[in-house]
Curated annotation (Swiss-Prot):
Single GO term (MF): DNA binding
UniProt protein name: Sugar fermentation stimulation protein homolog
Species: Pseudomonas putida (strain ATCC 700007 / DSM 6899 / JCM 31910 / BCRC 17059 / LMG 24140 / F1)
Cross-referenced Pfam families: SfsA (PF03749), SfsA_N (PF17746)
HAMAP family assigned to the protein according to its UniProt record, in alphabetical order: SfsA (MF_00095)
Family: Belongs to the SfsA family.
Amino acid sequence: MRFSPSLEQGRLLRRYKRFLADIELASGEQMTIHCPNTGSMLNCMREGGQVWFSRSNDPKRKLPGTWEISETPQGRLACVNTGRANALVEEALRAGTITELVGFTALKREVAYGEEGSRIDFRLEFEGAPAYVEVKSVTLGYPDTAVAAFPDAVTQRGAKHLRELAKLARQGVRAVQLYCVNLTGIDAVRPAEEIDTAYAQALRAAVADGVEVLAYGTRLDAEGIVIDRRLPVLLTP
């Protein structure tokens, strides 16, 4: 995924009302940009920290700028635009980068499924046998470790998705939880037990029921983002 044009850089002044952020450009100009992330953005939101944003030429947009990347306190880069994860994964699926999911004959997005009113990110068809793939974007890192964690806040919705995947797996349907790690300098992923114990327990239960868990890392900068490597998932605390 290439950013065209390249991202512009600024300094974060504040984030507020969930969807808004004020930044200062190198020229000293201040502007308000859209924040496409409804989560806590723990570790990705530091006043005075460097941020990168895309700029739209659409005259109908009230805010032309969209926050894309943050520099974390550890000096890593994190893609905070959660909408990028599914696009990155689809790009990688079609390119054959995610080797565990190579060979599908059709791809459908946002397919309704399950008993709790869920929508799966991707349904892949493999010679008549489907695979259901749920994508989560990972941006939470910690000092002195190259292990990222998910989630960065309590997520009942995330636990619901794991329950739905587990039900599919128990029925013999291929079900996959895929973590897209949009954070540089990471070698592995784990559930953030210290933030959401219920999610961590749901993940381990889903694996016991047959859900496949995959994690892939990205390479990212102001020019673009690409999924480039498989990462291990550490399930035990």
